[in-house]
Amino acid sequence: MKVRPSVKPMCEHCKVIKRKGRVMIICAANPKHKQRQG
């Protein structure tokens, strides 16, 4: 999980979701692409 000030999808499999008011990226194809904002 990367924590970054700005999160962007890294590949076509990355999905942008919101959990508890936080913007997150989850990726089924490459778990290294997981990110959280803040």
UniProtKB/Swiss-Prot annotation:
Superkingdom of origin: Bacteria
Keywords: Ribonucleoprotein, Ribosomal protein
Record GO terms (molecular function): structural constituent of ribosome
InterPro entries membership: Ribosomal_bL36 (IPR000473), Ribosomal_bL36_sp (IPR035977)
Keyword flag Ligase: no
Homology family: Belongs to the bacterial ribosomal protein bL36 family.
Protein name: Large ribosomal subunit protein bL36
Organism: Latilactobacillus sakei subsp. sakei (strain 23K) (Lactobacillus sakei subsp. sakei)
Organism lineage string: Bacteria, Bacillati, Bacillota, Bacilli, Lactobacillales
Encoding gene per record: rpmJ
